[in-house]
């Protein structure tokens, strides 16, 4: 969407993030299969898509706000049951999500501080 709107820089960053998310899903699916589980990839949550760039980032930010505590809880559970391989996978994902959270927070704050239009110009 961002590239279609003319925001190449923002589109490239979000594309990188989407590939990162796909890799996270692959790692989790591989681990679940290794543990003789069946991954549930059919359960979909509400998709949050904004109608303009800053709103899109705010939607992504809300997803990270929920994901980070969930990941921390899952890491604690893995430690409790001594599943250190799953814990390490989840820690790696947590690191990535925290970086994305920080980037999103910074971009949203910048759009507010320098003005939405100025920020959007910087994303072209």
Predicted segment positions?
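Iron-associated oxidoreductase/ferritin-like identity signal
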Residues: 1-124
């Amino acid at each position: 969407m961002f590239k279609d709107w003319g925001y190449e820089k923002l589109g490239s960053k979000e594309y990188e993030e989407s590939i990162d998310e796909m890799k996270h899903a692959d790692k989790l699916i591989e681990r679940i299969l290794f543990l003789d589980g069946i991954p549930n990839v059919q359960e979909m949550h509400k998709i949050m898509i904004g109608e303009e760039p800053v709103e899109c980032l705010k939607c992504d930010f809300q997803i990270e706000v929920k994901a980070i505590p969930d990941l921390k809880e899952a890491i604690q559970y893995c430690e409790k049951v001594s599943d250190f391989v799953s814990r390490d996978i989840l820690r790696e994902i947590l690191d990535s999500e925290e970086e994305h959270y920080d980037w999103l927070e910074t971009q949203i704050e910048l759009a507010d501080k320098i003005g939405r239009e100025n920020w959007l110009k910087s994303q072209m």
